[in-house]
Every structure is written in structure tokens, then in C-alpha cells.
């Protein structure tokens, strides 16, 4: 059967019942004709000067034009609590189980996410209460919307202290999955590209992004409020997935990898040598307490925080971030960091191995003297008790592990460079309490040479007041 329905063109004004302060203008007409299973529509409607103060929302104009089996719509100057939005699109008017949008273009000159969320929160207060679920195991219904082809173009997006510019991407929606493809944007003075998809029912999020020229210091400060932690210019690549409504759910479900490369940067307090050397076992040892103050003051003028490159790969699974590994190249200190970080407990458990220039290790006093590589050279003035205890502050590792510690960034060859290892463990919110252990590293040959030398030191004669190895040797020879 066929039908023909026509309304009369008439301008009108009114308000929305649920929002007493609202107002709008409406005019237009529509024709419906053809078969019921495939009706054709002509005409259109125009909404003007919509204002809903309760939602902090205004709309200058919205047009709906029927084109037979489809309709074009346009939203002009939609303001959401100070954020503007322009929307254009086309959807099918044919009867279907899904609302099919063939084209959807969204643009904005300024979008403040936090203020827009305020609009959303206000709207939820007016939404009808959701009926109780009949079964805890019942699955949410599929979203009956398909977006075949769309785009976003946002000149500026602000959330918190994060300011993102020139965001462009293609968008689509099908089978509950919202896709953002060919994303291009500028953030933290750098460029970000990639693809993002999200299942709107399960909240599963897949993120594949690459970044170049990112200001790390700005990113950490603006995004996480972390000041003086790390600086430099970064490139990164992510291939991760996560889901969940809470931070705990998201971190526990987080899977995938993040690779990064930071150039010409600087560590915060953690990279200062005085904070690395003064580990818990050094602080608590009676062997170094009298000399510790002088050692620390001598190190404060040495800059070990700068690096030419910091790079690595992070892998995520079951709430744990694994460093596989992370390395840094500095002029006088290079690092090899491996271990894991518990994202839920904010807890670190890592080993930091370092190559340190000999000119710096020479400033470490008795701590530097018990390095197996230096022990024989510095032994003459070394306390005999300290010398015999060297093995407590030394760890022997295979040659291949030793060679994995990076060289210096300036390609300077320092054959007398020393290597040490830190055990970093504890609450990341207390960075200066994390360094539990400091030990010199030695190959089997270096370690055995030191052991042989210490074993060759004669025992002091009875009643001797000699304290250094040199004094003991002189007494015995006498």
C-alpha cells in the first residue's frame, strides 16, 4: 500500500518540558509518500536559538533536510559550557534495526573536556532511572547505530593541564566498536599518529600510536603532575589494550608494549650520583660512616643526570610493567635498568647496573677503594678491615652481562671505568628510599684477583696498633 502524509509549514516556539528555563524556535514541513516498507521523505525542519540553561547548552541552528530515502542534518554553533561544536551528516530514513549514518563530520575550534563532562553530569540528573537488571549475567544490548564514514577535526582540546592541537581523524562505528583511524594530532610540542578502537559495550580499548618530538618534561608535568622527574625529547610507539571503568580494572587488564627513545634529556633526583651511591647498605655500614659526609659533599658538583639517549621497551601484563630493559647513555654515567613495576601497588623491583667514569669513582673515598678493579691500586692506605670486607659490597657477574651495560655517550673509551649495581625496591612515591643496595660489579677474573690479593695481606702482629695495609706490611717486614 502507498501513503501520502504532509504537515503544514508553521513557525513555532516553545520549551522542553523537562527543562523549564529552556526555549527554542521550530519551523518546517515534511512529506511522507511511497510504500510503507520503503517510504520516501521530503521537506525538512529547522531548530533555532535553542537554549537549555539547566545543561549550560545553547544551539544557534540545526537543520534537517529529507532527501527521499535519506536525510541530511547540520548542527551549527552548538555550545556546551563554553565549548563549540559543528556537526554535519547524512542518515538513512529506511526502516531498519539499526540507525545507519552514512556520513558524520564533527568539528570544533575549542573543546574543554572537563567542562563538557559537567554538561554530561547535569544531563544524567534529568535522565530516567535505569530499571534494575533482571539477571546479573544478562548481556547488554548491542548499540543499534552504524556510522559508515565520519571525521573529526578539533582545533584545540583541553583537559586538565593538557592542551592538544589540530586533531584530525576518520571515525566509524559498527558491531559496538568505535574506530578512530589515521589519527593526527599535536600534543606536548610533538606529533602523534595512529589508530584507536573501543568496544562501547565491554570498554575494551586498543591503542596503536606513534609519537615524535614529545617534550617529556611538559608531558609528565601536564598529564601527571610530576615535576623535575625527567626531561628530553621523546619518540614512542604503543601497541596496548585495556578495559574497565576503574583504574584498577584498567591496569590489571593492560596488555601490550610501549617502546620509547628520549634524546638529550636529564633525570630528576634519581639520577644524581649522591642519591644512587648512598644506598641503604652503605648508609648502615660502620665501615663508611665517618667518611660518608665528605663523599656526599664531593659528589654534589658532579653532574650525572644528563644523558644523550634513554631508550627501552616496556611490556604490560596482569598489572605488571616489565622493563626489557631500559638503557641510558651519559658522558660519565650510563645505565642498564631491568626489572618490573607493579602498577597497582606503585611498587618497584629493579636492578640498575651502571658504567661510571674513573674520574668520578676516584672521588668515592673508601667506597671506591673497595671496588675489586681498584683494590690493589688503592690498598696501601686502605683500612685492613675494610679491605677484607670488600666481597660484601661486590657482586660477580658473567662477562656477557657486564658488556650489556652501555658505553658512554661521547664514545670515550675509559678502560678504568667502574661498574656497579643498585637494587631498587619499594614504594615509588618515596624515590629516595628506593635504593636498597649498592655493590660493585666484577667479572670472575677481577673478583678472583681481588680475593687473592686480600688473602695475601699478612695478619697484624700481636698488640699491633696498625690500621692500614701499609702499616701492617711495615710491621711484619720489621
Identify the residue ranges that each predicted region occupies.
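Short, small-residue-biased leader/transition segments that mark boundaries at the very start
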Residues: 2-5
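Transmembrane beta-strand segments that form the barrel wall of outer-membrane beta-barrel proteins
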Residues: 9-15, 44-49, 70-78, 151-155, ...
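Extracellular loop and loop/strand-boundary signature of outer-membrane beta-barrel proteins
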Residues: 16-18, 222-227, 298, 439
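Extended terminal
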Residues: 66, 76-85, 90-96, 104, ...
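Flexible, solvent-exposed coil segments and beta strand-coil junctions
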Residues: 8-12, 41, 65-70, 147-150, ...
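Tryptophan-anchored aromatic micro-motifs
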Residues: 45, 106, 147-157, 257-265
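Solvent-exposed loop/turn segments connecting transmembrane beta-strands
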Residues: 20-25, 52-56, 79-86, 159-163, ...
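Flexible beta-edge/linker motif
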Residues: 31, 90-116, 146, 248-250, ...
Amino acid at each position: 500500500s502507498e501513503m501520502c502524509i504532509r504537515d503544514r509549514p508553521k513557525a513555532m516556539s516553545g520549551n522542553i518540558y523537562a527543562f523549564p528555563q529552556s526555549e527554542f524556535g521550530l519551523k518546517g514541513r515534511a512529506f511522507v509518500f511511497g510504500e510503507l516498507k520503503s517510504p520516501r521523505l521530503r521537506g525538512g525542519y529547522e531548530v533555532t536559538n535553542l537554549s537549555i540553561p539547566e545543561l549550560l547548552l545553547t544551539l544557534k541552528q540545526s537543520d534537517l533536510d529529507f532527501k527521499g530515502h535519506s536525510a541530511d542534518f547540520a548542527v551549527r554553533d552548538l555550545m556546551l559550557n563554553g565549548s563549540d561544536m559543528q556537526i554535519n551528516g547524512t542518515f538513512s530514513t529506511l526502516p531498519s534495526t539499526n540507525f545507519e549514518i552514512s556520513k558524520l563530520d564533527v568539528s570544533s575550534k575549542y573543546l574543554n573536556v572537563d567542562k563538557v563532562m559537567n554538561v554530561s553530569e547535569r544531563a544524567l540528573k534529568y535522565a530516567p532511572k535505569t530499571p534494575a537488571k533482571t539477571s546479573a549475567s544478562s548481556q547488554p544490548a548491542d548499540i543499534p547505530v552504524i556510522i559508515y564514514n565520519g571525521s573529526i577535526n578539533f582545533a584545540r582540546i583541553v583537559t586538565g593541564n593538557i592542551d592538544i592541537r589540530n586533531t584530525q581523524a576518520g571515525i566509524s562505528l559498527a558491531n559496538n566498536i568505535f574506530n578512530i583511524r589515521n589519527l593526527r594530532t599535536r600534543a606536548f610540542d610533538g606529533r602523534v599518529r595512529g589508530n584507536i578502537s573501543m568496544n562501547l559495550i565491554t570498554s575494551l580499548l586498543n591503542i596503536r600510536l606513534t609519537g615524535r618530538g614529545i617534550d617529556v618534561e611538559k608531558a609528565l608535568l601536564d598529564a601527571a603532575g610530576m615535576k623535575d622527574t625527567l626531561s628530553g625529547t621523546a619518540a614512542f610507539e604503543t601497541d596496548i589494550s585495556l578495559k574497565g571503568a576503574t583504574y584498577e580494572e584498567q591496569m590489571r587488564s593492560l596488555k601490550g608494549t610501549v617502546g620509547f627513545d628520549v634524546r638529550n634529556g636529564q633525570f630528576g633526583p634519581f639520577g644524581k650520583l649522591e642519591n644512587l651511591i648512598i644506598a641503604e647498605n652503605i648508609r648502615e655500614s660502620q665501615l663508611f660512616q665517618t667518611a660518608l659526609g665528605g663523599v656526599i659533599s664531593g659528589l654534589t658538583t658532579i653532574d650525572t643526570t644528563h644523558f644523550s639517549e634513554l631508550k627501552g621497551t616496556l611490556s604490560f601484563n596482569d598489572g605488571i610493567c616489565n622493563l626489557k630493559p631500559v638503557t641510558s647513555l651519559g658522558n660519565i654515567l650510563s645505565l642498564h635498568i631491568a626489572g618490573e613495576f607493579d602498577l597497582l601497588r606503585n611498587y618497584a623491583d629493579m636492578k640498575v647496573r651502571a658504567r661510571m667514569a674513573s674520574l668520578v669513582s676516584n672521588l668515592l673515598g673508601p667506597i671506591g677503594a673497595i671496588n675489586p678493579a681498584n683494590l690493589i691500586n688503592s690498598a696501601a692506605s686502605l683500612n685492613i678491615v675494610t679491605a677484607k670486607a670488600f666481597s660484601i659490597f661486590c657482586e660477580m657477574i658473567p662477562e656477557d652481562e657486564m658488556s650489556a651495560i652501555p658505553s658512554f655517550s661521547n664514545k670515550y673509551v675509559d678502560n678504568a671505568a667502574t661498574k656497579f649495581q643498585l637494587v631498587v625496591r619499594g614504594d615509588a612515591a618515596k624515590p629516595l628510599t628506593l635504593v636498597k643496595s649498592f655493590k660493585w660489579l666484577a667479572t670472575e677474573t677481577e673478583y678472583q684477583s681481588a680475593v687473592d690479593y686480600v688473602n695475601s695481606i699478612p695478619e697484624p702482629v700481636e698488640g699491633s696498633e696498625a690500621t692500614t695495609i701499609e702499616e701492617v706490611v711495615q710491621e711484619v717486614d720489621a
